């Protein structure tokens, strides 16, 4: 049995608090991968992470996080770009998470890290090679 550690938050005396809870018997998707990315918020840069989970289920492409419309349009840019390098999106449930959650992600600078992390989750790029990579850029 695989245990997943989740962070649970709440309010106690007007102060946020967090604790770790373990849920036995839950597994992540068979293909999970993460990459470091960066973005701009006004004139300030910030560190971000792009995570993908490819799992069995109805084929869909979900993007989670505080995203601008330009980032949401990445679905089609990624589909076309991956098709041109003979690496089509899998016919499975793809969930892409952009963090940190409190900052609006905008622009096309998240296209490249999203493409790389999808390729790594499919096994077409070794996931261990992405651990020390920072990716920012568009695809076309």
Protein language model regions, located:
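Peripheral, non-AAA+ core regions of ATP-driven protein-machinery
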Residues: 3-140
